[in-house]
From Swiss-Prot:
Protein name in the entry: Anhydro-N-acetylmuramic acid kinase
UniProt-listed SUPFAM superfamilies: Actin-like ATPase domain
Function text: Catalyzes the specific phosphorylation of 1,6-anhydro-N-acetylmuramic acid (anhMurNAc) with the simultaneous cleavage of the 1,6-anhydro ring, generating MurNAc-6-P. Is required for the utilization of anhMurNAc either imported from the medium or derived from its own cell wall murein, and thus plays a role in cell wall recycling.
Organism placement in taxonomy: Bacteria, Bacillati, Cyanobacteriota, Cyanophyceae, Synechococcales
Organism: Synechococcus sp. (strain CC9605)
Binding site for ATP: 9-16
Length: 379
């Protein structure tokens, strides 16, 4: 079955689209990635999405216009990726504007903005969306949702494999080996903390909006990281939590950046960006070390994907801090770094069609497995 996956993440830079084909048993599908495409958000739309994700108040009319603009961007990405309309089913994550994990016995909630009936009408094909709702209803975090799909797509290794997505937020998937004592272990996963979110906001601030990200790590390469503050930041509550845990721009947004820049004092732009970049790598390294110390799991591979994979300074910091794991990009496994999450949501849509569960309760904290997503047929 041909499926189209659409993903727009916390970096809010645009929509990644993937056309893929899935066949065979749901738990171990045969798959091929046929096309992928990135559709950039217009700068004003990107600005509005970032502001909404940080709790900026907006009148209802602007919320409606934002939902329409996001949906149209998804449609444009889908049409560009699949001009011949081969896909029989669309899996669309939507744009997260707020994520609230469960806390103090209060139910979690997460809002992925999308007008799914409009998207189904524009594409004249069924759309599966609202993937997080079922897991949240079962008491889970609703995130991360990629681990089960990661294991199905990129499993079968001789040792533990770690998959690291470097979007706005850094999240890890740990896939158990196909042989040995751990072969029956459950897949693991969680959100580590900021990857590009603070770096991108810092670049906008230091360049007065001229640059929205640190292209090629150029700014970070000119600076020196403040290791003392990095170690202090690693002691903060979120980074000491054990999984399941999830987070987003509501925690690591402009207010958080302002606090950290104030703590860095008179640091130059280059030193501040270098520190934020090293910090993003350090939160991942600390989580992997906590995993090793707590349950004895040490991945032999660390496979990166997402926009941060294109930042050589961030990759060098990961390589330096995550010793013992061979670092490589997901492209080495046949999945372009910018296509991984869109491929996951294409698979989740196919699983929804097949009635196959998509969450991992040990990862999200949900009370049981669930088929994820809500299907909307074209009008």
């Amino acid at each position: 079955m041909h499926c189209l996956g659409l993903m727009s993440g916390t970096s809010a830079d645009g929509v990644d689209a993937v056309l893929a084909r899935f066949d065979g048993p749901p738990q171990r599908p045969q798959w091929s990635l046929l096309r992928h495409h990135h559709q950039s958000y217009p700068l004003e739309l990107q600005r509005q999405v970032v502001a909404a994700g940080q709790g900026a108040p907006m009148p209802a009319a602007l919320w409606l216009e934002l939902a329409e603009a996001i949906t149209e961007a998804q449609a444009e990405a889908a049409l560009a990726c699949d001009p011949d309309a081969k896909a029989e089913l669309i899996g669309c994550h939507g744009q997260t504007v707020w994520h609230r994990p469960p806390a103090d016995e209060a139910r979690g909630a997460s809002w992925q903005m999308l007008l799914a009936p409009l998207l189904a009408h524009r594409l004249q094909r069924p759309v599966v969306h609202d993937f997080r709702a079922a897991d949240l209803a079962l008491g889970g975090q609703g995130a991360p949702l990629v681990p089960r799909a990661d294991a199905a797509l990129l499993g079968s290794t001789q040792g533990w494999r770690a998959l690291l997505n470097l979007g706005g937020i850094a999240n890890l998937t740990l896939i158990p080996p196909c042989s040995g004592n751990d072969r029956h272990a459950a897949v693991l996963g969680w959100d580590c903390g900021p990857a590009n979110s603070l770096i991108d906001l810092g670049m906008r601030q230091f360049t007065n909006g001229a640059q929205s990200f640190d292209q090629g790590g150029a700014m970070a390469a000119q600076g020196h990281a403040d290791e003392l503050w990095i170690q202090r930041w690693l002691e903060e509550e979120y980074f000491q939590l054990a999984p399941p845990k999830s987070t987003g721009r509501e925690c690591f947004g402009q207010a958080d950046l302002n606090r950290r820049l104030k703590q860095l004092g008179g640091a130059s732009a280059a030193d501040a960006i270098a520190t934020l970049t090293a910090f993003s790598a350090a939160v991942v390294a600390q989580d992997l070390e906590h995993l090793r110390q707590s349950v004895g799991i040490a991945p032999i591979e660390l496979i990166t994907a997402g926009g941060g994979s294109q930042n050589p300074v961030l990759i060098d910091e990961l390589r330096r801090r995550c010793r013992g794991a061979q670092l490589d990009a997901s492209s080495s496994l046949g999945v372009p770094t910018e296509a991984r999450e869109a491929l996951v949501f294409a698979l989740l849509a196919w699983w929804q069609e097949r009635g196959h569960p998509g969450n991992v309760p040990a990862v999200t904290g949900a009370s049981r497995e669930a088929v994820l997503g809500v299907r909307v047929n074209p009008a």
